[in-house]
């Protein structure tokens, strides 16, 4: 059986990421979230992925989006921002819907302050990409698309 080509992926960005390009440019550079989303939409076309994007400074909005993604999306790419290190609720939402998730960070969180070294999201994600600037997002999108397609190939094996 042929594998459905088009994947549906939700990109979530947490608190303060709307300030990319203006905030801590020595850490994050001058690229804006709008720039990142434009690039990802082009990448998504090449990957045959339907990409939806949402940024919120509010934990509950992100949790609602994760809940709403259940049954509508195949996977998630998330940069939880500061919620990475604090939000059990965000972690539980991801675990609860069971959607494959890739966690991304522009900076290498393990080369920064020690409080950034712990992620509540990583244990429920299929992978984590950090330290490649805006390319962390591009790598994250490619990673989730590859993961989902490989999983679909296994599910659609020759005798199924």
Swiss-Prot record:
The keyword Amino-acid biosynthesis applies. One of its GO terms (molecular function) is 3-dehydroquinate dehydratase activity. The active site is at residues 28, 105. InterPro entries: DHquinase_II, DHquinase_II_CS, DHquinase_II_sf. The keyword Lyase applies. Coiled coil: none annotated. Keywords: Amino-acid biosynthesis, Aromatic amino acid biosynthesis, Lyase. The record marks 23 as: Transition state stabilizer. It catalyses: 3-dehydroquinate = 3-dehydroshikimate + H2O. It is an enzyme of class 4 (lyase). Its EC number is 4.2.1.10. Pfam families: DHquinase_II (PF01220). PANTHER family: CATABOLIC 3-DEHYDROQUINASE. This is 3-dehydroquinate dehydratase. The lineage of its organism: Bacteria, Bacillati, Cyanobacteriota, Cyanophyceae, Gloeobacterales.
């Amino acid at each position: 059986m042929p594998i459905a080509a088009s994947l549906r992926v939700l990109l979530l960005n947490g608190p303060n990421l709307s300030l990319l390009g203006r905030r801590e440019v020595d850490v994050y550079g001058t690229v804006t979230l709008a720039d990142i989303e434009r690039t990802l939409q082009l990448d998504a076309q090449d990957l045959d992925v339907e990409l939806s994007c949402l940024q919120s400074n509010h934990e509950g909005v992100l949790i609602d989006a994760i809940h709403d993604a259940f049954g509508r999306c195949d996977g998630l790419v998330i940069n939880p921002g500061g919620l990475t290190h604090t939000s059990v609720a965000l972690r539980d939402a991801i675990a609860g819907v069971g959607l494959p998730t890739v966690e991304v960070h522009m900076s290498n969180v393990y080369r920064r302050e020690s409080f950034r070294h712990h992620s509540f999201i990583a244990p429920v994600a299929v992978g984590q990409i950090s330290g490649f600037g805006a390319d962390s997002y591009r790598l994250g999108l490619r990673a989730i698309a590859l993961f989902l397609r490989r999983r679909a190939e296994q599910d659609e094996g020759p005798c199924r």
